[in-house]
């Protein structure tokens, strides 16, 4: 059964899921988990190590396992990985389980933020070299075009590139509280 107070944050890498998530959870009086952090804790390996040693399909299965373990939760904000929704099983689970919130940023903002992150696979070329901002922008644009249809399935949208963090949290809190009230009346 769909639980409107089980909140899933989606968006591209560096869109703000891990930053906004705990602040939003606190504002709502909810708990918070970050799927990537949960996987790292369970596996005792970094995301990059998991991808390198066991591959993406294994990682996507881990994501689904974490989602399944929280399926009965309420009053919880979950930061998804940037590519979680690419997994059909995860996407369908999330749509049926709770409320999807899309944290959207433009390509230039995402590329700029990514250029400051050393630990992201998107930052590296085929031989492990750091990419130029132009190459990062190209990658972001291609991946975003692929992921956008799933991101756009969200019930709530927040633009995170030009809005101050505090304003984003306030706006999202109001939108989510309205969404929960509206959906509690219909259930």
From Swiss-Prot:
Catalytic activity, EC: 2.7.1.71
Broad class of where this protein is predominantly found: cytoplasm
Residues that, per the record, bind ATP: 14-19, 120
Gene Ontology molecular function: any one: shikimate kinase activity
Listed GO CC annotations: cytosol
Pathway linked to the protein: Metabolic intermediate biosynthesis; chorismate biosynthesis; chorismate from D-erythrose 4-phosphate and phosphoenolpyruvate: step 5/7
Organism domain of life: Bacteria
Alphabetized InterPro entries for the sequence: P-loop_NTPase, Shikimate/glucono_kinase, Shikimate_kinase/TSH1, Shikimate_kinase_CS
Record: residues binding Mg(2+): 18
Entry cofactors: Mg(2+)
Pfam families recorded: SKI
Cofactor binding comment, as recorded: Binds 1 Mg(2+) ion per subunit.
Cellular location(s): Cytoplasm
Gene Ontology process terms (BP): amino acid biosynthetic process; aromatic amino acid family biosynthetic process; chorismate biosynthetic process
Reactions that this protein is recorded to catalyse: shikimate + ATP = 3-phosphoshikimate + ADP + H(+)
Binding annotation for substrate: 36, 60, 82, 147
Keywords: Amino-acid biosynthesis, Aromatic amino acid biosynthesis, ATP-binding, Cytoplasm, Kinase, Magnesium, Metal-binding, Nucleotide-binding, Transferase
PROSITE patterns: SHIKIMATE_KINASE
Subunit architecture: Monomer.
PANTHER family for this protein: SHIKIMATE KINASE (PTHR21087), SHIKIMATE KINASE 1, CHLOROPLASTIC (PTHR21087:SF16)
Function summary: Catalyzes the specific phosphorylation of the 3-hydroxyl group of shikimic acid using ATP as a cosubstrate.
Family membership: Belongs to the shikimate kinase family.
Protein name: Shikimate kinase
Gene (UniProt): aroK
């Amino acid at each position: 059964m769909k639980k409107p107070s089980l909140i899933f944050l989606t968006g591209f890498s560096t869109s703000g899921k891990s930053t906004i998530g705990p602040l939003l959870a606190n504002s709502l009086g909810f708990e918070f988990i970050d799927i990537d952090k949960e996987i790292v804790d369970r596996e005792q390996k970094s995301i990059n190590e998991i991808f390198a040693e066991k591959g993406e399909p294994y990682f996507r299965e881990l994501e689904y396992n974490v989602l399944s373990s929280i399926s009965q939760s309420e009053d919880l904000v979950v930061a998804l990985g940037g590519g979680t929704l690419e997994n059909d099983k995860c996407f369908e689970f999330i749509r049926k389980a709770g409320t999807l919130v899309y944290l959207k940023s433009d390509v230039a903002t995402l590329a700029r933020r990514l250029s400051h992150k050393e630990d992201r696979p998107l930052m590296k070329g085929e031989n492990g070299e750091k990419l130029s901002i132009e190459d990062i922008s190209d990658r972001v644009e291609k991946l975003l075009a692929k992921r956008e249809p799933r991101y756009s399935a969200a019930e709530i949208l927040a633009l995170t590139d030009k809005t101050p963090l505090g304003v984003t949290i306030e706006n999202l809190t109001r939108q989510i509280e309205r969404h929960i009230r509206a959906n509690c009346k219909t259930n």
